[in-house]
């Protein structure tokens, strides 16, 4: 899910800190029978929050836009900071032993003029992951 080769290497933040701007965020969530993706893209002072589902088609899967809303970019950055997004960089949540099924996620965010935050996991999530997904679902409904 690389966004573009022009961005800087991963940032290695302290456990605390904030981002000052967002260019793009993609959160990919999948499970046994579902795959969905949330995408936030910022242009100027507006942030487009989009929700996609992946549908089975004849030759694989199709990414289909279900809903899109616009929010203020500053509001989105403030919310992402409340979830401690910067501290997610480098998170790798390996699948817990003995768990046979679960939800997997992959996140990539381009922030602060080109720095990239990456995180992924399988039934193992960074702090405030649930709050982020609840917030995304809430703004889209």
List the predicted regions and their residue ranges.
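Acidic, aromatic-enriched beta-alpha/helix-loop junctions
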Residues: 53-81
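Conserved long hydrophobic alpha-helices within structured protein cores
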Residues: 43-46, 75-85
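Short, flexible N-terminal segments of the mature chain
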Residues: 38-58
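Short, well-ordered, aromatic-rich surface patches in folded extracellular/luminal domains
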Residues: 2-37, 65-70, 82-141
């Amino acid at each position: 899910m690389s966004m573009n080769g022009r961005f800087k290497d991963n940032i290695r933040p302290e456990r605390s800190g904030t981002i000052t701007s967002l260019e793009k965020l993609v959160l990919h969530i999948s499970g046994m029978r579902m795959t969905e993706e949330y995408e936030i893209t910022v242009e100027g002072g507006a942030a487009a929050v989009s929700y996609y589902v992946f549908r089975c088609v004849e030759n694989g899967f199709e990414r289909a836009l279900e809903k899109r809303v616009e929010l203020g970019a500053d509001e989105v950055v403030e919310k992402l900071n409340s979830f401690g997004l910067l501290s997610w960089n480098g998170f790798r949540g390996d699948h817990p032993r003995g768990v046979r099924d679960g939800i997997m996620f992959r996140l990539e965010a381009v922030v602060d003029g080109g720095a990239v935050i990456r995180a992924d996991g399988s039934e193992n999530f960074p702090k405030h992951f649930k709050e982020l997904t609840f917030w995304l679902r809430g703004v889209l409904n």
